Structures are given as structure tokens and as C-alpha cells.
Amino acid sequence: MRYITVEDLSFYYDKEPVLEHINYCVDSGEFVTLTGENGAAKTTLIKASLGILQPRIGKVAISKTNTQGKKLRIAYLPQQIASFNAGFPSTVYEFVKSGRYPRKGWFRRLNAHDEEHIKASLDSVGMWEHRDKRLGSLSGGQKQRAVIARMFASDPDVFILDEPTTGMDAGSKNEFYELMHHSAHHHGKAVLMITHDPEEVKDYADRNIHLVRNQDSPWRCFNVHENGQEVGHA
């Protein structure tokens, strides 16, 4: 099922074109990476696709329902989330638990299934053993993993991730990529992830969308084949 469709999107800053004629899509059960050199407007494309920034022209269609006919839920993880207010008076467990309420309902009590899901979310990023620590005591990488665990606790249908493995070591990165691959292929999630290093994730992602440009022209979007060759518009 197609969750996100972007057609002929163009975005301008102060009348200067940044993105031009962008076309791409993301389906349920698919893990897609978005790459491009530094300054390639990857984050701008994500924000324009989500409506955080208003594209100048083009169409963005996001499905209203998931594969079960329920309201589609999207989790967006922006870049540098480790800089969030870690002075928030909460333990890691309480922080991750708060991510469950939008799915459950703010005024409904969590049951044993919810608690199991919270534990699994913490386990998935190696944070269960840190569950009783205060957010303010965490390292940058641990804060990143705590925010990711909270995102998992909300059980979204679509993951939009902007360089989510910042601050993680190589082993933790591979575990995260495997987790996202599993979420897509075994649970029908749609994953769109910005990464600066496509080589790290090539064994896990289904395809890569690459932003390129010629000289000073705006960035355009291309699919990248397994052999690294550009094969046309995404």
C-alpha cells in the first residue's frame, strides 16, 4: 500500500530554487534511504513532504489509513534530537512510556500489553537497563536511543528519520538498521531514513533515493540501483 506520494515538488528559499521537480514514493513494507552530499536539502525535502515547509509547487499525498483501515500514524524523528531538554524531570522509562499514550488514548490506563510494548521498545535500542536513569544523566548517544525508543512505543505506521544513528557506535547502528528492516518487512511499516553514508545501510534498505544536481542547478531526485548507478527519477 502506498503511504507517501510526492509529485513534481519544487521548493524555493527567497525566490531561489532549492529542490526542483521531485518525485518519489514510499510504500508499506519498504525501507527507503535518502542520500546526498552535505547541503543537498535532504532535510528540506522531508519537511516539505510532511507539510512543515510549504513547497512552491507540486503535490504531496499521504494516505489517511494504514493497511488495516485505521488512521495512519507517522513518527518524525528530526536531526539532532539529543539536544532536547534533558532536564525534563523524568526517568527514561517514564519518558518512553509517554510515547504510548497517543496510541492508547491520554485518559486510558495502560495494560499489560502496553507495558510489554514499552519494554520491547527499550530493549530494541539497548536502553532497558537504563530505564530508571534520569534523562539529564544520559550521554548524547543514550538520549538519542531514548527518543527512538519513545518513537517505537507509539507504534507508528510510517517512520521518517533524519540521521537517527548520530552518536551510535558501529554495532548499535547495525542493530538499528536491522530493526528498521524487520519493522518494514515483518510488520508492514514504511521507513524513510536520511543517511550521510549509504554504504552503512545498503545491506538493510530496499532502495535508495539520491539527491543530485548539475553545477548550480537545484537538487533533483534519482533512484539509485544496487550497483550505485543512477537509473532515473524516483
UniProtKB/Swiss-Prot annotation:
Name one process (GO BP) from the record.
zinc ion transport
Domain ABC transporter residue range list: 4-234
GO MF terms, alphabetically ordered: ATP binding; ATP hydrolysis activity; ATPase-coupled transmembrane transporter activity
For this protein, the record's PROSITE patterns field holds: ABC_TRANSPORTER_1 (PS00211), ABC_TRANSPORTER_2 (PS50893)
Q: Specify whether Signal is a keyword of the entry.
A: no
**Cystine bridges:** none
Which key words tag this protein in UniProt?
ATP-binding, Competence, Ion transport, Nucleotide-binding, Transport, Zinc, Zinc transport
- Look up the domain of life of the source: Bacteria
Q: Name one GO cellular component term.
A: ATP-binding cassette (ABC) transporter complex
For binding ATP, which residues are annotated in this chain's numbering? Answer: G36, E37, N38, G39, A40, A41, K42, T43
Please explain the role this protein plays, according to its UniProt record: Part of the ATP-driven transport system AdcABC for zinc. Required for transformability.
Name listed for the protein in its UniProt record: Zinc transport system ATP-binding protein AdcC
